[in-house]
Amino acid sequence: MSTLSLNDTCPGNLHGTSAELFLTLLNTLLTAKCSLGNPKNYPVDFGPNIRNGDEFDFIVIGGGSAGSVLANKLSENQDWRVLVLEAGGLPSATSDIPGLMYNLQETEEDWAYKTEPQNTSCLSMKNKQCKWPRGKVLGGSSVLNAMLYVKGNKANYDHWAELGNTGWDWDSIKEYFTELEQVLPPASETTPLGTDGLLPLTKHYSNEPIKMSLQEAYEQVGIKYLEEQNPEKPIGTVDVPLCIDRGQRANTGKKILGNYQNRTNLLISLHSFVQKITIEEKVAKGVEVEIGGNLLKLKAKKEVVLSAGAINSPQLLMLSGIGPKENLQSLGIDVVEDLPVGQFMQDHMISWHEIKLSLDAIRYPKGPADPLYEYFIRQEGPLSSLSLTNFLTFLNTKNDSMWPDFGFHYFLFPPNDQLLGPGVRKGVGFVDSIATTMSNECKSNPCLMMIPTLLTPKSMGQIMLKSKNPRDYPLIYSGSFTDKDDEDITVMVEAIRFNERLIQTPALQKYNPEVIRFPIPECDKLEYGSDAYWACFMRNVASTLYHPTSTCRMGVQKNESVVDPRLRVHDVKNLRVVDASIMPRVTSGNTHAPSMMIGFKASVMIKEDWLS
């Protein structure tokens, strides 16, 4: 039997300085790899210690963007035992690498939901279904998302307050964003953002030639660059902060729970599948949860708080008897409270406008080896930040300076991209003919994905139970482009028209931009470039920006909302919902930061209610 030997596989040996350098390189690579997905960065799983009948002060269902913040702040009171029940496990090493964001979809960290087929959207996706990834992992969707820290704008929150939700106007909630923010040096020296908060934020400015040209192109059409995102004056282009800490994703499970794992009253139970909330005489008493193959009944002395997200929170409410009466009765579920759970769902729709560019638009290498090396050695380069994805645009078709209704995100793919591009095409779920076209057109040239984004949708969808089996996924009807006056489609077509203007600017023309035409048989019957063509295009290739909200929305009237302005479920005691599902209307931007703000504000209200 031969013995493994390094000498056997190489023609010569390294000695002296060269050997030392080689060993240093290997050690650096191993150290970098071991820092990714390190379980020591997370709380120890308390699940094996839980027994049937155990009692806690607060039971928080879901350890995502909102739930992590809520549990952290509640556990500041050492007299309160706070249990977080998380359906998933710890985030993987892959999740720590920002540039591999799309590679996490349809893994064990993703619930991997899909919408039900509808005739208004997702028509050129496989099976006419859009993929709706949601985080099934400690940290929730902060483990899967694009790491963009976007607050929304003042008008969003003032509108919430105008609907009767006292205390949710911009002036009342902006302090909670500041409390969350920990902007890292050197940006912390000049930024108006907070510097001592829970979540590390990095200011990133892409040095790709095309990024600077995009900024110049916007200025050539009269759109200003904003040095910082300004919720009170949001129109313009801006580089938003990223939830990244020294090249690694800063998910809430790691930074907001893991960094406080020394608190003995903050308990995290992983792989804990909640089946229902136990309610007696309209008072929440606890939960039924499966942990380690055992079904346990746990008690909450004070409150049960649902922070399971805009899909799972309404599902659990309905399984527990809170929801639309007719739907629950048809499934044999006893009705506790007739409320519009799962209704009024909103989401940001995006489309895909791919532009082929000349080679001088990009600077980083053609192959995957150099970015990987750069990341593992220095945790820098394209994998550390998603390139120019944090360069955002907020615009308005109606010249309303306070409330943008569309904007743009951007992806930049190098020639024959083997890192981000394949993940995007697979993750979105295009039919093969479109995915192949996208790939083939970008083999020899870099491609810029200009992504029109619908920021103030009028359309609404809904979540419905498929059965009363908790393991059955709910039915997701996105409702995209179903508003009666087709305002959403009109705004998205206007966004394409804006793109066309932008491409014609001198700043972009120097790259010989060429719009890649996707093969869509239904749309190819129409005049290419007409409004009718682009409307057809939207119904076929538009997809989600992964921002479902409003399925347990906040309000005063029971027939139009699920929770009151203090996030208490109407007419059910000791039960709250604290996540993006409570938004009366979706904010005009990415929803991760607002979800964390909701968790923070909820903790303040809960403390007021129990300590006053």
Task: Give names to the regions the model predicted.
Residues 1-612:
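N-terminal redox-cofactor-binding region of secreted/periplasmic oxidoreductases
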